[in-house]
Amino acid sequence: MRPSMSLIRSVSRVARRGYSSESVPQRKVAVLGAAGGIGQPLALLMKLNPLVSQLSLYDIAGTPGVAADVSHINTRSEVKGYAGEEQLGEALEGCDVVIIPAGVPRKPGMTRDDLFNINAGIVRSLTAAIAKYCPHAIINMISNPVNSTVPIASEVLKKAGVYDEKKLFGVTTLDVVRAKTFYAGKAGVPVAEVNVPVVGGHAGITILPLFSQATPKANLSDDYIKALTKRTQDGGTEVVEAKAGKGSATLSMAYAGALFADACLXGLNGVPDVVECSYVQSSITELPFFASKVRLGKNGVEEVLDLGPLSDFEKEGLKQLKPELKSSIEKGIKFANQS
């Protein structure tokens, strides 16, 4: 996986990739839920990304203000805000990438699955609009529970006759970001140099960081590995509790969402060897959806990479996560097919 790159220095990043300002393709990106806790900082970070030429910000309300604020930033992209369902089609038309952080946030005592009944309906309606107005766009699903919302989106797209498994992604990048941060702290290595694959799903025990494959290598005890794994799995809860009922992991999620969207854009633009972890349709295991390393390209998913060698602890973790992940997938598919 590529090391995380500073979005603030995004212009120089593009120069390092060999683009001139004239050669960067025109790319329209939409953020659905742009007035929310994740959506606002995500809109800011996408405005800083020079791979974006048009930034479309949509929410049920509040978006004109967010769009006006962000539009004053002196970067490449043109920003437009859209509010209300009647403007959703215009927001989506011509999009290359659609990022969906829409939905209600977690509160203390809530799991991601507690959000299901509200967020599942939101995801279903937004995906139906994507199927109608930009059926070939890459979809980055942030709305929780991702283990279920990605299967919901797949079923909606299938019903519309436009499903392309290569273009639907569950964004699990925050799990990777957390695993890198926590590992670097314990291993005493520079965090910018750290890579840690995270596989499985995006909730609780379904999150499985593969610390045995982490680089740079560090000789950490089994107890340290178990503690790092648990902290990565509980990272969202850690933030919810720290915010004492006043929010969830909005800022770090926006950062992770922007990183993954940047990777998708780079792949679309033909940058070679862009590899990130994501929750996608997969044949890596017997489950229809699974998070693992994915090579990104001009069509979205170019290749879903194998899990690689696992430690005994990771093999057990993989075994333990499968029933819960299977249940979440089935829950999403059932919801999508109820109506």
UniProtKB/Swiss-Prot annotation:
It catalyses: (S)-malate + NAD(+) = oxaloacetate + NADH + H(+). Substrate binds at residues 106, 112, 144, 178. It is an enzyme of class 1 (oxidoreductase). NAD(+) binds at residues 33-39, 59, 119, 142-144, 253. Keywords: Mitochondrion, NAD, Oxidoreductase, Transit peptide, Tricarboxylic acid cycle. GO terms for molecular function: L-malate dehydrogenase (NAD+) activity. This is Malate dehydrogenase, mitochondrial. It comes from Fragaria ananassa (Strawberry). The gene is MMDHI.
